[in-house]
From Swiss-Prot:
Record's protein name: Protein ECM30
Region of interest called Disordered, as start-end residue ranges on this chain: 23-42, 405-439, 494-517, 803-842, 1100-1149
Domain of life per record: Eukaryota
Gene, per the UniProt record: ECM30
UniProt miscellaneous comment: Present with 1080 molecules/cell in log phase SD medium.
Low complexity bias spans: 27-42, 409-432, 494-515, 803-822, 1135-1149
Organism lineage string: Eukaryota, Fungi, Dikarya, Ascomycota, Saccharomycotina
Biased composition (Polar residues): 1110-1125
Swiss-Prot/TrEMBL GO biological process terms: cell wall organization
Localization (cell): Cytoplasm
Source organism per UniProt: Saccharomyces cerevisiae (strain ATCC 204508 / S288c) (Baker's yeast)
């Protein structure tokens, strides 16, 4: 990486210091026409001085600008000191954490000047929006773009300081006119004017819309347009700068809405920008803007493949140019979704955006939105089908391993069960065997999470869209959502393999391996799917299955062609006997859910209640549920059937239809019996489950009590099913009678537990009064991995004070030994026998397992840094935490609630007060009565099956008459089934808001270089501070003597940025070029789209190189301007200095450009080539030439990688103290060539370790860091 012009570097350094010491501002610009306010005393504290935003005697011009008179040049109004900040591109500031720290220092040491800089940038954007587009020059547009970029960087720092301050102070954006003297705001807050300016710039000619566009024209055709004809991008490829400017505006909006990031999840602060944006903007412009965002997103999803293929074939000169365009457009669409989701996250009745989306009811609009979501939602499923049908896959033995959520090797899968049988040893040969890789499941689409958030909001607010979604896609959405729950739940994978990781994550000396850190990155980023996408799908599943229309649709049968061609082979059912045309969506779903439950039981994983709740909603239904919903006054479901006609009322047709769709199939019935058999095992019911994450906040969700409640919920669902719809439950009743031993096993298990509890009355009282059931000792995490197979009930040791004291002593010894060995507490001396008593105090000292993502930082080296969300330890996002768990669950039936349990008598036997006892006794009585009438059921052959069902159907009235008095009162009153439903509450809305921000942060965080340069250390010494210690802490002000030394040390070496005013235009332009050079190794931009397959259709990869600025050069050739492509042909040569051979040379080969790689100390003899070229340029170059080159990228038909990176990789919020969720940083040292060669053998060993999968594929130094749908950079 070459060095920029040293003069401009010195100017920017002086400006940064001048913001801290305002009285020193004149030294940075001797020709300045203004000075600090003369009303301030000379003896005032230098840090209290306030640099004026406007020039002296500019009052009339300022009044004219605020009076909507756009003919006043902005350069004649604003102080040149502030104009310097937007005279060069500051994009690189945003990706350098050290510069973020300097900005934090400026904000802390001198808040007035930092606020003035923000006010200046805001005013420049506001006044530029009011100016006529035709009057703008290239310099003006370039400064406007830089102002938008710079304000996007400063806003999070401003919010960080304001939210963390304990003192009350006014907000510059929402202050009154009296608090901001000199600004004729006319009682309109600055923040509102800024939002209005952004809205105006969003539809301004030659900035965000085409010159020929109408002011009320949308960005894209679709919603709110009479014409349905798609306007292809083929006619707009040469105007890519319009999309770049739109992206910048959307990023600025997201930054303005981000004040919530700096408040804790439980604190409710008013987000003024979001409130004003949703309620105070002009209604017509807000609707126009919202429609444009929707249309651009939907058209991109539906039409991008065809468009980009045509662009690549007919217009672009190279594949790289096409990739740059695709990357830019993808980021633009992604930002559209971010702004839409943030706008809808503000729940208020006067939200204009929500009101508009609520009123969408035209079928074309609804179809456009739904079709786009379906394409994104089915993307990985279509890729899996395509991978299976690929002819080249038949030539090898590799296949998709979908048995344990992800593709793993056969050997590792076989060893996964053995890891539960005994404590794994780090020396075990099984863990040093090199695995044989298999093709992994396709990645989800990067837009799936924000699109799912958008769909959730639309279903919640728009009744027409909810009805359309339920009628057209709900049944298929349910089966595909279960596909995601089955194969993309990485949390269950991490819990089953955490023992192995705990033994391999540290070395013998306790230091962390690079491989384990990289693996931690993989796991934590996979949690963005497990902790955001899957809860969203769970929420939608519960909402949809509570609707009678959706339940009616689930009784429809599969089409043979659809089942064959639209489901992956590994997701199809293997035990289906008979015609696929008789398989209903309900049967398929129940079987898949049963398999998931059995899988969790097999490995004793933490139960997932969504599986049981979905079975509860889907099981007790028949084909009359849609019509019966209109007969009940208590039903709030008013969705109507849109697509299919109701079935014929003829008896023959009704009978045939009833047989094929309404009855539960025998295969589905047997799946439920397997669940009852395994979940009622005595060992399973009396042991803690393996927790998803190591945390002390989830005793109930892994406790035996939770397992018993889920079993009771399943028994209640079966009881309601045959009580309300006896004929449809015949197959299930037949299976339960034929396998009557299962119900007796449930009864025996409950009785055994009850007898064990009866032996200790005190223990029994605890069980009856507490919701939790647990151990009476500290939980030993390794005990969770000693459960392999369900056998007999072990001996139950009862609680006593004597053995409790002995256990406490033994526990302390085990803890000390475990800490000395750097392992989790709980060794082989600790008995794994469970105790059926929950002692809350036993978990107080349990420390949740955490992964150390920070390594010791060496200030002499450079690091690649990635900021990501630590989902595991974040209690606001991770729904596995106790407090955040229950708001996301539906209200269970009254007999299973905590309130009902508290009403049970204290000293009753457990088998009498257990929530499932009443349903179990009813089932036992029904089975006994059926066997007394039809005793041959356990011995019949398949040919007698239908005859036996006829006999069973004849017993309907007798059975219902017998059990009716014994039914619980709430079941007895039911005339139609009432499914579980979700109810919106404040905690649920808060989680959705946090999840929205978590997705935005994940998708806008990029890799950046953390460089500790000599100039940065000099800056620290001059200000007498330590930047490394200034992360969120109070920064002490430097003394006046120290600031005086700064002024004297700068002396005559300060260089000014002189300006000349072009006659007639009034536009000030620099007299010298501000050049920035770029190495040949930077700007490598990877494609995220390829065109031939479904996978290549959506594959998105972000550039691993840091952003690069546009080279601004002034050249003359025969008095005409020469347009140069940025960072392409006219790039200043790289400076060859003595430092190019040492360890710092990796800075130049790196793709990123750092603010602190500039030469701060003034002119450098080694950098003379750049200065010489600058001094040899003609000082009399005309303004038109300069302005054209300053904004030349706006007129180039082909987009360069440097420009794309410059616009995209901004890391707006990285480096600030985000408090809404927990942020972790992963640092990886950047090795120079010399360091890499000196550690060749170490590197060789690193590559050939047993974790070579991670080294070679995930974080190899020689590979680019790629962005995947899980937020992983590799």
């Amino acid at each position: 990486m070459g060095n920029t012009d040293s003069k401009s570097s010195s100017i920017l350094l002086n400006h940064c210091i001048a913001l801290v010491r305002p009285e020193d501002a004149d030294a940075s610009s001797p020709s300045r026409t203004s000075s600090p306010s003369p009303s301030l005393s000379v003896d005032a504290d230098p840090l209290s001085l306030n640099l004026s935003i406007f020039k002296l005697d500019s009052g009339p011009d300022v009044e004219a600008l605020f009076s909507d008179k756009p003919n006043v040049p902005l350069d004649t109004v604003f102080n040149d000191f502030y104009l310097d900040f937007i005279s060069v591109d500051v994009q690189d500031f945003s990706i350098n954490s050290s510069f973020k720290k300097i900005l934090h220092i400026i904000s802390s040491l001198n808040p007035p000047n930092f606020n003035n800089l923000i006010v200046f940038l805001s005013l420049y954007i506001i006044l530029s929006a009011n100016s006529l587009p035709a009057s703008r020059t290239g310099l003006h547009s370039s400064r406007l773009i830089n102002a938008i970029k710079t304000l996007s960087i400063l806003i999070p720092i401003y919010f960080d300081r304001v939210k963390s301050s304990t003192q009350d102070h006014y907000d510059v954006f929402w202050a009154t006119q009296h608090e901001i003297e000199g600004l004729p705001l006319q009682n309109i807050p600055l923040g509102e004017r800024l939002l209005l300016a952004i809205l105006k710039l969003a539809f301004q000619d030659n900035f965000t819309t085409a010159v020929t566009a109408h002011p009320s024209e949308l960005w894209e055709i679709g919603i709110l347009t009479n014409s349905n004809k798609y306007r292809s991008l083929l006619n707009m490829h040469h105007q890519w700068h319009l999309f770049a400017n739109r992206l910048l505006l959307l990023r600025l909006l997201a930054a303005l809405f981000s004040s919530d990031l700096y408040t804790s999840g439980g604190k409710q602060d008013i987000n003024m920008f979001l409130v004003y944006w949703c309620t105070q903007m002009p209604k017509d412009k807000s609707i126009q803007f919202t429609s444009s965002l929707l249309n651009c997103t939907m058209r991109f999803i539906l039409n991008n493949n065809k468009d980009f293929q045509s662009l690549k074939a007919n217009f672009f000169s190279s594949d790289a140019t096409a990739s740059n365009w695709q990357t830019l457009y993808f980021q633009f669409v992604q930002s559209c979704l971010h702004v839409l989701n943030l706008s809808m996250s503000y729940k208020a009745q006067d939200n204009v955006i929500t009101i508009f989306l609520t009123q969408l009811q035209r079928e074309y609009d609804l179809k456009l939105i739904l079709s786009s979501f379906i394409k994104i939602f089915k993307y990985p499923i279509d890729l899996a089908i395509e991978q299976e049908s690929n002819i080249f896959n038949f030539t090898n033995n590799k296949h998709i391993d979908a048995s344990r959520r992800r593709a793993v090797s056969t050997s590792s899968h076989d060893n996964s069960s053995s890891s539960h049988a005994s404590l794994p040893s780090s020396s075990s040969a099984a863990y040093h065997t090199k695995p044989q890789t298999k093709p992994q499941l396709p990645e989800i689409h990067p837009l799936l999470i924000p699109m799912t958030i958008l769909m959730t909001n639309l279903i919640d607010c728009n009744k027409c869209f909810q009805n359309y979604f339920a009628d057209k896609f709900a049944s298929r959405f349910i089966i595909f959502s279960i596909y995601y729950l089955k194969y993309y739940d990485y949390s269950s994978l991490s819990s089953s393999s955490s023992t192995t990781r705990s033994n391999s994550s540290t070395t013998s000396n306790g230091t962390s391996n690079d491989t384990s850190n990289e693996r931690s990155i993989v796991e934590l980023n996979e949690n963005s799917v497990s902790q955001i996408l899957l809860p969203l799908l769970n929420h939608l599943l519960l909402i949809l299955t509570s609707k009678k229309l959706v339940l009616f649709k689930m009784l429809q049968t599969f089409n043979l062609n659809y089942y064959t061609n639209n489901l992956p082979n590994f997701y199809k059912l293997s035990n289906i006997n008979g015609d696929i045309n008789n398989l209903t969506f309900r049967d398929f779903t129940v079987i898949q859910l049963s398999n998931l439950i059995l899988d969790n039981i097999k490995f004793n994983l933490q139960p997932n209640p969504i599986f049981y709740e979905l079975i509860y909603n889907l099981l007790p239904i028949n084909d009359e549920i849609l019509t019966s919903s209109h007969k009940n006054d208590d039903s709030h479901d008013d969705l109507i059937l849109l697509s299919a006609k109701k079935k014929s009322a003829s008896p023959s047709a009704a009978t045939s239809s009833h047989t094929s769709s309404s009855k539960l199939s025998y295969n589905a019935a047997m799946s439920l019996l397997y669940v009852l058999s395994k979940s009622s095992n005595k060992v399973y019911l009396t042991t803690y489950a393996t927790p998803v994450f190591k945390t002390k906040d989830i005793p109930y969700m892994i406790s035996p009590g939770f397992k018993m409640d889920l079993l009771a919920l399943l028994l209640r669902s079966i009881t309601i099913f045959f009580t309300l719809y006896f004929d449809d439950a015949e197959n299930l009743l037949f299976a339960m009678v034929r396998h009557q031993s299962i119900t007796h096993q449930i009864n025996d298990s409950i009785n055994s537990i009850s007898k064990a509890l009866d032996m200790n009355p005190n223990l029994n009282s605890h069980i009856m009064t507490l919701k939790q059931m647990g151990f009476n000792r500290k939980v030993q995490w390794k005990d969770f991995y000693q459960f392999e197979e369900i056998t007999d009930l072990p001996q139950v040791n009862l609680y006593s004070s004597a053995n409790q004291q002995h256990q406490n002593q033994q526990q302390g010894q085990n803890d000390n030994r475990g800490q000395n060995q750097n392992e989790d507490p709980g060794q082989e001396n600790e008995s794994p026998t469970p105790y059926l008593l929950f002692n809350p105090a036993s978990l107080e000292n349990e420390t949740p397992g955490t992964v150390k993502h920070f390594s010791s930082t060496n200030h002499d080296k450079n690091y690649q840094v990635i900021a990501f969300i630590d989902f595991k330890s974040d209690s606001n996002l991770n729904l596995q935490h106790q407090l955040e768990y229950w708001p996301h669950r539906p209200q269970w039936p009254t007999p299973l609630t905590f309130t009902h349990k508290c009403k049970n008598p204290k000293y009753e036997n457990f088998n009498e007060v257990w929530s499932g006892t009443v349903y179990l006794q009813i089932l036992l009585r029904v089975i006994k009565q059926i066997l007394s009438k039809v005793p041959e059921i356990p011995r019949i052959k398949s040919v007698q099956y239908f005859e036996t069902l006829s006999k069973l159907s004849a017993l309907r009235s007798d059975i219902l008459t017998t059990i009716h008095p014994r039914l619980p009162l709430d079941v007895r009153r039911l005339t139609t089934f009432q499914p579980l439903s979700m109810h919106t509450n404040d905690k649920l809305l808060m989680w959705f808001h946090i999840a929205t921000w978590a997705n935005i942060f994940t998708q806008t965080s990029f890799k950046y270089e953390e460089t500790f340069s000599h100039e940065l250390r000099q800056f620290e010494s001059l200000l007498d501070i330590s930047i490394d210690e200034c992360e969120g802490n109070t920064i002490s002000k430097p003394t006046t003597d120290r600031l005086g030394y700064i002024r004297r040390s700068r002396g005559q070496s300060s260089v000014s940025l002189e300006r000349t005013i072009s006659a007639g235009s009034g536009v000030s332009t620099p007299t010298m070029a501000l050049n920035r050079t770029k190495s040949n190794g930077s700007g490598n931009l990877m494609n995220y789209f390829f065109q031939n397959t479904a996978q290549n259709h959506f594959q998105h990869l972000r550039s691993s190189s840091s952003s690069s600025s546009i080279t601004l050069e002034k050249t003359t050739s025969n008095s005409s301007s020469i347009r140069t492509r940025p960072n392409s042909h006219h790039v200043a040569p790289e400076t060859n200095n003595n430092n190019s051979t040492n360890g710092n040379s990796n800075n130049s080969s790196n793709g990123g450009f750092s603010f602190f790689k500039w030469k701060w100390g003034g002119n450098n003899s080694n950098g003379g080539s750049d200065d010489t070229k600058a001094s040899q340029r003609d000082p009399n170059v005309s303004t038109s030439i300069i302005t054209d080159n300053l904004n030349s990228y706006m007129f180039e038909e082909e987009i360069s990688p440097g420009v794309v990176n410059n616009i995209i990789e901004n890391n707006i919020w990285v480096g600030t103290d985000i408090r809404l969720f927990k942020i972790a940083n992963f640092r990886k040292e950047s090795f120079s060539f010399l360091e890499m060669t000196s550690s060749f053998f170490k590197k060789f060993k690193f590559i050939n370790s047993d974790n070579d999968n991670y080294n070679n594929n995930e974080f190899d130094d020689n590979t680019q860091l790629r962005y995947t749908s899980r937020g992983l950079y590799r």
